[in-house]
UniProtKB/Swiss-Prot annotation:
Positively regulates DNA damage-induced apoptosis by acting as a transcriptional coactivator of proapoptotic target genes of the transcriptional activator E2F1. Likely to play a role in ribosome biogenesis by targeting serine/threonine protein phosphatase PP1 to the nucleolus. Involved in regulation of mRNA splicing. Inhibits SIPA1 GTPase activity. Involved in regulating expression of extracellular matrix genes. Associates with chromatin and may play a role in modulating chromatin structure. (Microbial infection) Following influenza A virus (IAV) infection, promotes viral mRNA transcription by facilitating the binding of IAV RNA-directed RNA polymerase to capped mRNA. Belongs to the RRP1 family. This is Ribosomal RNA processing protein 1 homolog B. The gene is RRP1B. The keyword Chaperone does not apply. InterPro entries: RRP1 (IPR010301). Changing V684A: Abolishes interaction with protein phosphatase PP1 subunits PPP1CB and PPP1CC. Residues 259-272, 397-408, 469-481, 566-575 have a biased composition (Basic residues). Its main location: nucleus.
Length: 758
């Protein structure tokens, strides 16, 4: 038994949805012929189910088409099928089944395929208007067509997706103006927008109301007073040439000027949706929109009355009434504005021209005023500049007079000693260079203070060398040498006077100048040479030693103790050990307290080493700086020897056991005293390269064995180790850690062994 033949509609649907383009193209051509043949009779033809099957095949025929140009061609071919239907009833059914298919399949369309279906909807709507146009815009056909649209798209019961509905509202007036803009009258256009008036008045969807208001009614308001483009261009050229006077400009021309920008916005709104026509056909080579045809004509008063009638019903929601009332007012204003005489428009235009002339005159006046202001400002600036130059010249003359006085009061010194007066001369030129100012603050200030401290008659005439601060001066970091010189100059001059008065240890300079001593000292400091007795300045004693004892007396034990901590403090301040400079203390109390503290520290150290006391007493007995430098070198060698573990002295371990035999052989006193030495602010570095502790071996597996016995306890706070890591040596000679290296006068000690370090 042969299988039953499938209906033709199903076969067309299968071939239309084929993946091969040739099969689809042949199916579309045969479908056109099939529709034309089947609808030749006035009654009958296709049923709704048959047309739904055909439209489903056409929908998926559009689905599988991928290239944009081919998509546009296929969409136009599908839209032209409505003209193949010879029966008017079949035509409306064909259009109705199209909207039903789009409503059913819309939610399954992905984002990449939306554009071609937007284009398909636009072209089908355009061809639907073409059907009405070919039938002469018959009212019966218009009514049936609008009923189909109302039922399948706009009505809430249609369950049409918002994408289909909103796109239909956006393109409705655009496609209607393209097809019937030249033929349709205001009454006919009112019938075409009547479904939107009904839906906007009774729907409860606020978004739909707003979309209808913007896409239909506000678009009508925006394009309201337009005239054909040919007359518009002619009138524009005439107005530009000045052939027409203000009274001869027609009413439409005035409204046209105001609505040129609105036309562009309306066209932009009509092409807002993404579709193939707006992308490819909507623009020509110059980038402008294609000709949309003549604009639709509307009776604004009739539109306002129709909206007022719909909103005056009791079942109209408040939101819809409020939104539509604004549109009603706009349409009423447009209807009233169309009856204004041409004279009023001419007066408005003349007033606008007068305003433009006045504004141009104001701009010219403002430009002249600005030029005058700039000229006045230039003149004022030149005057101010001249006054400033005069002031600067007068100030320079005054400064030069002061400099002459200073030159008469201060004698010149050759060589580097003359740096201070030259820098004082530059003090008057502070605005000229900030670098000289910084040098003046660093060098000239100690020299000025030294001259004022000599007590001669020139001290009263010289102002104190205080650095003048300026806001624009760059902050410069002072060198440590300049900082120490400032401190020395602040402390030393009265003490130098006390020394030079009774003892006469400060002779005058080579020319007897009051500042010669300070400048010579400065020059020698720069050269890095310390003067010895008999050449220039003698080495001054330390300030705390001058207060307690005579500077020229023999060295005593306490003074020798105080020199060592002061030398250590000086060593911290210095960058290198080769230069010997004075150290100024802030006050006498702090110096005495620090001195006493250091005396206690050094007394403990000297008790254990008698040689240190004899060596520390030599520098002051000699009275020269060479012994101080040798003492400092010995001190540094002693500290470095302690760090390198050259002496067998060992620190007290954290965990240790007392050696039984060590009590009888070695007295514990010195060791305890050495361990109890108070902490000082000295910096200690340890030479870890001599560390001989056993290195941990990664291959040692003893730690992997779990312990047994009492050591299995996780944590016992009372448990103590059996022995410490560091062990006290049983027989190690006790000696001081700070003993300086000297020639061995006694029997040499034995060489330390490895057991002495553990």
């Amino acid at each position: 038994m042969a299988p039953a033949m499938q209906p033709a509609e199903i076969q067309f649907a299968q071939r239309l949805a084929s993946s091969e383009k040739g099969i689809r193209d042949r199916a579309v051509k045969k479908l056109r012929q099939y529709i034309s043949v089947k609808t030749q009779r006035e009654t009958g033809g296709f049923s709704q189910e048959e047309l739904l099957k055909i439209w489903k095949g056409l929908f998926y025929c559009m689905w599988v088409q991928d290239e944009p140009l081919l998509q546009e061609e296929l969409a136009n071919t599908i839209a032209q099928l409505v003209h193949a239907v010879n029966n008017s009833a079949a035509q409306h059914l064909f259009i109705q089944t199209f909207w039903q298919t789009m409503n059913r399949e819309w939610k399954g369309i992905d984002r990449l395929r939306l554009d071609k279906y937007y284009m398909l909807i636009r072209l089908v709507l355009r061809q639907s208007f073409e059907v009405l146009k070919r039938n002469g815009w018959e009212e019966s056909r218009i009514k049936v067509f609008l009923d189909v649209l109302m039922k399948e798209v706009l009505c809430p019961e249609s369950q049409s997706p918002n994408g289909v509905r909103f796109h239909f509202i956006d393109i409705y007036l655009d496609e209607l103006s393209k097809v019937g803009g030249k033929e349709l009258l205001a009454d006919q256009n009112l019938k075409f927008i009547d479904p939107f008036c009904k839906i906007a008045a009774k729907t409860k969807d606020h978004t739909l109301v707003q979309t209808i208001a913007r896409g239909v009614f506000e678009a009508i308001v925006d394009q309201s007073p337009f005239v054909p483009e040919e007359t518009m261009e002619e009138q524009k050229t005439k107005v530009g040439d000045g052939d027409l006077s203000a009274e001869e400009i027609p009413e439409n021309e005035v409204s046209l000027r105001r609505a040129v920008s609105k036309k562009k916005t309306a066209l932009g709104k009509n092409h807002s949706r993404k579709d193939g026509l707006s992308d490819e056909r909507g623009r020509d080579d110059c980038g402008t929109f294609e000709d949309t045809g003549p604009l639709l004509q509307f009776d604004y008063k009739a539109v306002a009355d129709r909206l007022l009638e719909m909103t005056s019903r009791k079942n109209t929601p408040h939101f819809n009434r409020k939104r539509l009332s604004k549109l009603i007012k706009k349409f009423q204003d447009l209807s009233e504005g169309s009856s204004i005489s041409q004279l009023s428009f001419a007066e408005d235009i003349s007033a606008d021209e007068d305003d433009q002339i006045l504004s141009q005159g104001k701009h010219k006046k403002k430009g002249n005023k600005l030029l005058e202001k700039t000229n006045l400002e230039k003149e004022k600036g030149s005057r101010v500049f001249c006054v400033e130059e005069e002031d600067s010249e007068s100030s320079l003359q005054k400064r030069r007079r002061k400099k002459k006085k200073k030159h008469h009061l201060q004698p010149e010194n050759p060589g580097p000693g003359g740096a201070a007066p030259s820098l004082e001369q530059n003090r008057g030129r502070e605005p000229e260079a900030s670098g000289l100012k910084a040098l003046k603050a660093r060098v000239a200030e100690p020299g000025a203070e030294a001259t004022s401290s000599t007590g001669e008659e020139s001290g009263s005439e010289h102002p104190p060398a205080v650095p003048m601060h300026n806001k624009r001066k760059r902050p410069r970091k002072k060198s440590p040498r300049a900082h120490r010189e400032m401190l020395e100059s602040a402390v030393l001059p009265p003490e130098d006077m006390s020394q030079s008065g009774p003892s006469g240890s400060h002779p005058q300079g080579p020319r007897g100048s009051p500042t010669g001593g300070a400048q010579l000292l400065k020059r020698k400091r720069k050269l890095g040479v310390v003067p010895v007795n008999g050449s220039g300045l003698s080495t001054p004693a330390w300030p705390p030693l001058q207060q307690e004892g005579p500077p020229t007396g023999p060295a005593e034990g306490a003074n020798s103790h105080t020199t060592l901590p002061q030398r250590r403090r000086l060593q911290k301040k210095k960058a290198g050990p080769g230069s010997l400079e004075l150290c100024g203390l802030p006050s006498q109390k702090t110096a005495s307290l620090k001195k006493r503290k250091k005396m206690r520290v050094m007394s403990n150290l000297v008790e254990h080493n008698g040689v240190l006391e004899s060596e520390a007493g030599q520098p002051q007995a000699l009275g020269s700086s060479g012994t101080c430098s040798s003492l400092k070198k010995q001190k540094l060698r002693a500290e470095s020897d302690f760090v390198k573990f050259d002496t067998p002295f060992l620190p007290k371990p954290l965990f240790f056991r007392r050696a039984k035999s060590s009590t009888a052989t070695h007295p514990p006193g010195p060791a305890v005293q050495l361990n109890k030495t108070p902490s000082s602010s000295k910096k200690v570095t340890f030479g870890l390269n001599r560390n001989m502790t056993a290195e941990f071996k990664k291959t040692d597996k003893s730690i992997l064995v779990s312990p047994t016995g009492p050591s299995r306890v996780a944590f016992d706070p009372e448990q103590k180790p059996l022995h410490g890591v560091l062990k006290t040596p049983t027989s190690s000679p006790a000696s001081s850690p700070l003993v300086a290296k000297k020639p061995l006068t006694t029997t040499p000690r034995r060489r330390p062994r490895a057991m002495d370090f553990f």
